[in-house]
Regions:
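Acidic/His-rich, metal-assisted hydrolase cores and their charged scaffolds
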Residues: 2-216
């Protein structure tokens, strides 16, 4: 909802400007994403040079004509009754909860639909199961046939990846970094990042376990 949705909307606006997407409606169906987008629009001083140049030439990428923001639950339910082409951007990204789960439930058996998973999905989540492209999947206790096309787009994560984290830390004074704590992500990925940091000259890297205490 925060970061990734806005990047997707910005990308769609650019694709529309290039004539690669027609005038089909785009719905952002997530109250948090709607509110977060308003925050983005209120703070242009945080935009980079590319974004300022785009605003000058093309206008607001978060407000093009066919873009609609959905906050109310009843409006969200109405989207499931549509039979014309549309793009629905919804959360959560891993499809484990939220409105997106209902959209998948209502459209996964439709061979004319495409479900695109954007970004990382943790093991065991509905999103991770969909990425494996099963022939059937259980949602809300009901076994459904997967007739929709399943696609993935891994380049749009709101989180810094392995190399971006190392690059960020490489700009810090290593002598002043007394300890680095890795507290987010799967253990195997944390261990891989820890090894990458060690290879780049960082020391005292900890992967805390639940209730473990450290003296700082």
């Amino acid at each position: 909802s925060v970061g990734r949705t806005q990047e997707i909307v910005f990308t769609l606006d650019k694709l529309k400007g290039q004539g690669k997407i027609g005038e089909i409606p785009v719905f952002v169906d997530s109250p948090l994403a709607v509110n977060a987008t308003e925050v983005f629009k209120l703070h242009p001083e945080c935009y980079d040079n590319e974004m300022h140049e785009y605003l000058r030439k093309e206008g607001d990428p978060f407000g093009f004509n066919s873009l609609h923001y959905v906050s109310e639950l009843e409006q969200s339910k109405e989207l499931n009754e549509m039979d014309s082409p549309a793009i629905i951007i919804s959360a959560s990204g891993m499809a484990q909860a939220g409105r997106v789960k209902h959209h998948i439930f209502h459209n996964i058996e439709n061979q004319n639909c495409t479900i695109m998973m954007v970004g990382y999905c943790a093991d065991g989540t509905l999103g991770e199961k969909l990425i494996k492209k099963p022939s059937q999947i259980k949602i809300f206790g009901e076994l459904l046939n997967v007739n929709a096309r399943i696609e993935t787009l891994s380049s749009m994560s709101a989180h810094a990846d392995h190399f971006e984290i190392i690059d960020f830390l490489s700009n810090q004074n290593k002598e002043k970094l007394k300890s680095i704590f890795l507290v987010h992500g799967e253990l195997k990925r944390q261990e891989r990042l820890k090894n990458g940091l060690i290879e780049n000259g960082f020391n005292h890297i900890e992967i805390p376990i639940l209730e473990q205490e450290f003296k700082l």
